[in-house]
């Protein structure tokens, strides 16, 4: 049995400013006045992280997928339970986001 079960009903949404995937998407865009500090930080390091912003007890790490024209098209994310070190996960999502972006 799984330690946790996560599912979304079709049509369920949350604000783009919540959670690592949304933060990564915003970080892939030019800076905006009044943006969350997490977006500014994600833009500087190339990835975003969040803990419990969308689902309590879950952490996410995400990176923007930027195409060859420099346009952010998507985000790659890994969501997991717990609060383990994210550096290895961050390296993974950044590498895969770059690989996807180079194919666009």
Give short role names for the model-derived ranges:
Residues 1-31:
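Amphipathic alpha-helical effector-binding/dimerization core
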Residues 66-72:
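Flexible loop/coil segments at beta-strand boundaries within sensory signal-transduction domains
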Residues 14-16, 50-53:
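Short Gly/Pro-enriched turn/cap motifs at secondary-structure boundaries
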Residues 21, 58, 71:
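Conserved catalytic motifs of the protein kinase core domain
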Residues 26, 61, 79:
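Residues in well-ordered beta-strands of folded domains
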Residues 48-50, 63-65:
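Cytosolic beta-strand hydrophobic patch enriched in CBS
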């Amino acid at each position: 049995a799984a330690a946790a079960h996560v599912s979304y009903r079709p049509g369920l949404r949350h604000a783009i400013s919540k959670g690592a995937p949304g933060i990564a998407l915003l970080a892939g865009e030019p800076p905006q006045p009044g943006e969350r500090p997490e977006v500014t930080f994600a833009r500087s390091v190339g990835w975003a992280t969040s803990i419990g912003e969308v689902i309590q007890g879950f952490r996410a790490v995400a990176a923007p997928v930027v195409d060859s024209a420099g346009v952010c098209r998507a985000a790659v994310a890994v969501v997991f339970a717990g609060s383990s070190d994210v550096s290895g996960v961050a390296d993974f999502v950044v590498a895969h986001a770059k690989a996807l972006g180079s194919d666009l």
